Regions:
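Alpha-helical transmembrane segments and their helix-helix packing motifs
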Residues: 1-273
């Protein structure tokens, strides 16, 4: 059905302008198709896998057989779904297929790739994208998702924060770290400041700084990307969740996404992508 949940899915993927330009209904069938199988949406899963496969072919000799097969198999799996999504069950199957494929790719790269530039660039791209995704998901939930008629801390609010944790595979981690019911400020603390949480913003920045350091050491020079990543990490390390809520979590997340985009552009320019 239609509703804020599907609008939030579009916004968290940062494709709301593209979706609205197509004049499609904001419902499960159309949003699900747009985000997964739409060949005209450059951010759809289908298009992302096509790009990944094309890029993989271009650097095929630097990928292990296992890493290449993980990418190629994922592309073939999605192709089998065709171009339409007949029902909710199919949408769930697509999502599960992609999650399995991503885990397979991560595992193959981690276990088989040489620790040199190819691997570091793979991890760096993942890290920048992960930080962007975490920040956008947090902002959508905090700033947009709860209807004005619903109370903060009510059953719907609790359900939505729990769903967010499930979305980023962090519900078990949350319970392990905080050992209490789901609270918005603790979810934000986990996904922003907890260094042990792999997809937290600070963990992503630490990874980015380390990976850029490895590339700098191997290539003999540092550049703007190293400075941007280090400055962003330093600023976040000197803050805390209380400060962010007082100054405005939404404003912080918008600024973080912008700075993260600047980092991505600096990496592309520094290494001539």
């Amino acid at each position: 059905g239609a509703g804020p949940a599907w609008e939030s899915a579009i916004r968290s993927a940062a494709v709301d302008d593209g979706f609205l330009a197509r004049n499609l209904p904001m419902d499960e069938a159309h949003v699900g198709w747009f985000l997964t199988l739409d060949p005209e949406n450059p951010s759809s899963i289908r298009r992302c896998l096509e790009c990944a496969r094309s890029n993989g072919r271009a650097v095929r000799t630097s990928l292990t057989l296992e890493t290449w097969e993980a990418v190629n198999d994922a592309w073939h799996e999605v192709q089998r779904f065709g171009t339409t999504i007949p029902d909710s069950t199919t949408l769930v199957r697509i999502a599960d297929t992609i999650k399995d494929a991503l885990l397979m790719f991560d595992g193959a790269a981690h276990r088989t790739q040489l620790r040199e530039a190819t691997y570091w660039f793979l991890r760096l791209g993942t890290t920048v994208e992960r930080a962007d995704n975490t920040a956008r998901l947090l902002d959508v939930k905090y700033h947009l998702l709860l209807p004005r008629t619903e109370p903060v801390g009510g059953s719907l609010d609790y359900f939505q924060w729990t769903t967010l944790l499930r979305t980023v595979s962090a519900l078990t981690a949350y319970r392990w770290v905080y050992r209490e019911s789901v609270k918005p400020w603790l979810v934000a603390d986990l996904l922003i400041f907890n260094r042990a949480m792999p997809r937290s913003l600070i963990a992503c920045l630490e990874d980015a700084v380390w990976l850029l350091d490895q590339l700098a050491a191997s290539r003999g020079r540092r550049g703007p990307a190293n400075r941007i990543a280090a400055n962003s990490l330093r600023a976040l390390a000197n803050s805390n969740i209380d400060t962010l809520f007082q100054s405005g979590l939404h404003e912080f997340l918008v600024e973080f996404v912008g700075e993260n985009n600047r980092l991505g552009n600096a990496i592309a320019e520094q290494y001539l992508f």
